């Protein structure tokens, strides 16, 4: 779960690249729970998409959505999505304050929670570390983040490694290393 795969945001781009690549393996049944995504989105991709925004012209849903700031991140619709899709694994990769509510959801006992929280400073807030300890697995965007998680979480967190953001291989192509070395006069 993250921001909608079609948004021009860091989390949206990460969602697009990750879900597209997972889908191409043909190993997984995937669903995207898309923050800032409309309920009728997802017709352009081969995986299931659950939009988090309230349905247009549904005042009751809008009132619920607007009643709590965490609802923009999915807290108001998460359990309903889990009951419908019945995931084995819920993967999220956003800031701790965006996803820490997952720990207290009614459906939490029924899925494995894998989280890659943004860790770009040290120390992390103690309440976040306590939440990290309740995840089934933790990843980090960077080696620095992984080191912080391991040091602060000690044996309480299950840090499994880094999953640095990928690039779009159709846009960013590496230059041949030997050609660059020759052009720069590096032996």
Per-segment meaning from a language model:
Residues 136-175:
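Donor nucleotide-sugar binding/catalytic pocket of nucleotide-sugar-dependent glycosyltransferases
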Residues 29-31, 113, 157-160:
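Hydrophobic anchor at the start of a short beta-strand
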Residues 42-137, 143-147:
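Extended catalytic core of nucleotide-activated donor transferases of GT-like folds
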Residues 3, 35, 118, 143, ...:
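Cofactor-binding loop segments of dinucleotide-utilizing enzymes, especially the Rossmann-like FAD-
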Residues 1-41, 45, 85, 137:
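N-terminal subdomain of nucleotide-sugar transferases
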Residues 5-6, 37, 97, 120, ...:
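Short, glycine/serine-rich, charged loops/turns that create anion-binding
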């Amino acid at each position: 779960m993250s921001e909608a795969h079609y948004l021009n945001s860091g989390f949206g781009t990460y969602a697009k690249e990750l879900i597209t690549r997972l889908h191409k393996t043909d190993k997984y049944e995937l669903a995207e729970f898309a923050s800032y995504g409309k309920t009728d989105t997802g017709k352009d991709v081969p995986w299931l998409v659950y939009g988090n925004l309230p349905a247009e012209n549904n005042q009751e849903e809008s009132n619920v959505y607007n009643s709590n700031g965490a609802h923009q991140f999915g807290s108001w619709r998460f359990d309903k999505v889990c009951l419908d899709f019945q995931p084995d694994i819920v993967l999220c990769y956003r800031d701790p304050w965006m996803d820490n509510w997952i720990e207290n959801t009614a459906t939490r006992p029924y899925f494995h929670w894998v989280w890659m929280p943004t860790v770009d400073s040290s120390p992390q807030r103690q309440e976040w570390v306590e939440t990290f300890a309740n995840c089934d697995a933790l990843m980090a965007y960077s080696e620095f983040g992984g080191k912080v998680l391991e040091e602060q979480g000690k044996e309480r967190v299950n840090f499994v490694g880094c999953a640095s953001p990928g690039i779009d291989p159709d846009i960013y192509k590496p230059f041949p290393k030997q050609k660059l070395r020759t052009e720069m006069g590096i032996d």
